[in-house]
Design a protein with these regions (language model features):
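Alpha/propeptide regions of enzymes that mature by internal proteolysis
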Residues: 20-159
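Bacterial Sec-dependent N-terminal signal peptides
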Residues: 1-20
Length: 159
């Protein structure tokens, strides 16, 4: 029993010790153009805006259909509150996941407006919300109106 306790303690301690010494790519000598900004964050890039909403409801053991809930959405505006285009590409690491707007990105190598990141089951509503926001802010009310565009919304795992 003492052996199992000692082994468990050693594994836990080594995990935290490793987590605190993990180096970043730059620390390992991997070269990148430029230098990190003040916060080393996407918001250091001039013109980029990021917003998020985290939903936390309930506590304790997970009861399917009841909670607790830990989820949210992040929205990135690469060109701020404009509908200006920006270079875009996409990549699938494991072939599992949902993302809207891929055909346009593949065909033109461009994105327009906001990028949403949320849980799997909310990709559709986030895409629709981005489209509605685009219409509200960029529509000129013309017969042909491209302001809804092809919003990009992608999933990330909430777990």
């Amino acid at each position: 029993m003492k052996f199992l306790f000692s082994l468990s303690a050693l594994l836990i301690i080594s995990h935290f010790a490793h987590a605190q010494t993990t180096q970043r790519a730059r620390d390992l000598g991997i070269p990148f153009d430029g230098i990190p900004g003040k916060y080393n964050a996407i918001t250091d890039v001039p013109g980029v805006m990021v917003g998020f909403k985290t939903l936390i409801s309930g506590s304790g053991k997970l009861v399917e259909g009841k909670g607790p809930v830990r989820t949210g959405v992040t929205v990135i505006l690469p060109k701020g509150k404009t509908n200006d285009g920006y270079p875009a590409a996409w990549f699938s690491l494991n072939g599992d996941g949902e993302m809207t707007g891929i055909p346009y990105i593949e065909d033109y190598g461009m994105g327009y407006g906001a990028i949403g990141i949320t849980n799997t089951n909310s990709v559709g509503i986030v895409k629709d919300a981005i489209g509605s926001w685009n219409v509200k802010h960029f529509s000129k009310g013309e017969f042909v109106d491209y302001s809804f565009g092809l919003p990009v919304a992608a999933e990330t795992w909430d777990g």
